């Protein structure tokens, strides 16, 4: 029996990145031998065991043979005669097909070290094309390591295109697509994930609402980058700088979906695109089974981001009504989330990356003023039932009006 550290732990250590999870491959052993040594079996489809002390995963070396469609259609073979090289060959990328023995020596049968040095994401073998989930995984790795200047090898991107055009991605379940997307949204450069999907044709298949934005022009005065798809990826990049939250980043990604519905004869204007995009946000989220709390914010951002841009022109009643509409009284975090997504929208434009966004500050200040109006004082004044709500709203409007007069500049 020989045990090797494999995959991501080896890769990230070589890149000088923090190692989170460690996975091990066991060569020359059997399930019974592992059980006798005190390991606990957890793998249902192939032999994976938990170490009795560390609880890290130890998998018997195995090969995989395509036996059906999609990313689950594989037959596994695990036996003592499966070599380490056999096991590493089934992995997706060469940089993930590295192993380390107990002496610290790196085993590299597929030139993963060279590709690490050259910052290349390259598939190990043609078997890559048998698993459509790998298209998403490579896009996610490209996003994860973009800050290290990694790029996808030409032949790997070509294979990803072939897989997409062959309809392989249609076998992916919504849950797996969302899981990979959610993971990509946590990276430093989530926009790279969607750009890679577009480069291989997968964006049109998995995110048609986003793909439809490319080639749709916006007014050059407000959008020097012109193309709404490019603007969308720029805003996502900016959102990633402003917030680590997946819901903020996803809502920013979806904020302009309504522009894809504008008839070409009305281009480059997109009047009412915010509310129009709400249905597309719901359609995308329902198809991918996106969690409700993420859907809820994306819906609100699509509907209200343009309103926040015009904040100095809003009357106090409209401002308080906005807080009602986003349910800020019960979910105050939404004020900050809307401020961040709206700022990402404005700064996600060519030449505006360092622009100030005072509307975000005014939104936050107005919220502090509105929420500081005490409910207790209204009740103590003798108001009852529905009158309490009405009087509280009236006092909030008055407080915001007073604040706006002093703090918010009047529109030209």
Swiss-Prot record:
Q: Name one GO molecular function term.
A: tRNA binding
Pfam families per UniProt: HD, PolyA_pol, PolyA_pol_RNAbd
Name this protein carries in UniProt: Multifunctional CCA protein
- The Enzyme Commission number assigned here is 2.7.7.72, 3.1.3.-, 3.1.4.-
Q: What else is known?
A: A single active site specifically recognizes both ATP and CTP and is responsible for their addition.
The record describes how the cofactor is bound as:
Magnesium is required for nucleotidyltransferase activity. Nickel for phosphatase activity.
User: Which residues are listed for Mg(2+) binding in this entry?
Assistant: 21, 23
- GO BP of this protein: RNA repair; tRNA 3'-terminal CCA addition
Keyword line: ATP-binding, Hydrolase, Magnesium, Metal-binding, Multifunctional enzyme, Nickel, Nucleotide-binding, Nucleotidyltransferase, RNA repair, RNA-binding, Transferase, tRNA processing
Q: Per UniProt, where does ATP bind?
A: 8, 11, 91, 137, 140
Q: Where does CTP bind?
A: 8, 11, 91, 137, 140
Where, if anywhere, are coiled coils annotated?
none
Domain HD: residue ranges:
228-329
| Native organism | Escherichia coli O6:H1 (strain CFT073 / ATCC 700928 / UPEC)
Gene encoding the protein: cca
**Domain comment, in the record's words?**
Comprises two domains: an N-terminal domain containing the nucleotidyltransferase activity and a C-terminal HD domain associated with both phosphodiesterase and phosphatase activities.
Instruction: Read off the PANTHER family from this record.
Output: MULTIFUNCTIONAL CCA PROTEIN (PTHR47545:SF1)
């Amino acid at each position: 029996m020989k045990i090797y550290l494999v995959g991501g732990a080896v890769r990230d250590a070589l890149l000088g990145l923090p190692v989170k999870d460690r996975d091990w491959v066991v060569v020359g052993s059997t399930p019974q031998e592992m059980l006798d040594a005190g390991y606990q079996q957890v793998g249902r489809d192939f032999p994976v065991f938990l170490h009795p002390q560390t609880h890290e995963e130890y998998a018997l070396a195995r090969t995989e043979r395509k036996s059906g469609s999609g990313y689950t259609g594989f037959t596994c073979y695990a036996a003592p005669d499966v070599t380490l090289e056999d096991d590493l060959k089934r992995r997706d990328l060469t940089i993930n097909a590295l192993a380390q023995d107990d002496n610290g020596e790196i085993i590299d049968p597929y030139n993963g070290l060279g590709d690490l040095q050259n910052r290349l994401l390259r598939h190990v073998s043609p078997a890559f094309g048998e698993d459509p989930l790998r298209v998403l995984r490579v896009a996610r790795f490209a996003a994860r390591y973009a800050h290290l200047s990694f790029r996808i090898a030409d032949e790997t991107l070509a294979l990803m295109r072939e897989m997409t055009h062959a309809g392989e991605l249609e076998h992916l379940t919504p849950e797996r697509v969302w899981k990979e997307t959610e993971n990509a949204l946590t990276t430093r450069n989530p926009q790279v994930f969607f750009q890679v999907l577009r480069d291989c044709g997968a964006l049109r298949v998995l995110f048609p609402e986003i793909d439809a934005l490319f080639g749709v022009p916006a007014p050059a005065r407000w959008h020097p980058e012109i193309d709404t798809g490019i603007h969308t990826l720029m805003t996502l990049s900016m959102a990633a700088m402003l917030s680590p939250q997946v819901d903020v980043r996803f809502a920013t990604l979806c904020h302009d979906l309504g522009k894809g519905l504008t008839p070409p004869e009305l281009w480059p204007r997109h009047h009412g695109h915010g509310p129009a995009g709400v249905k597309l946000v719901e359609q995308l989220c329902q198809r991918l089974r996106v969690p409700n709390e993420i859907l809820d914010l994306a819906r609100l951002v699509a509907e209200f981001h343009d309103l926040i841009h015009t904040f100095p022109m809003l009357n106090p009643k409209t401002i308080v009504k906005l807080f009602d509409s986003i349910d800020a009284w019960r979910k105050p975090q939404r004020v900050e989330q809307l401020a961040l997504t709206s700022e990402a929208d404005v700064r996600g434009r060519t030449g505006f990356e360092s622009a100030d966004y005072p509307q975000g500050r005014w939104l936050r200040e107005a919220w502090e003023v509105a929420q500081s109006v005490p409910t207790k004082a209204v009740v103590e004044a003798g108001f009852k039932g529905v009158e309490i709500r009405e009087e509280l709203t009236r006092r909030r409007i008055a407080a915001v009006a007073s604040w706006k007069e002093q703090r918010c500049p009047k529109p030209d």
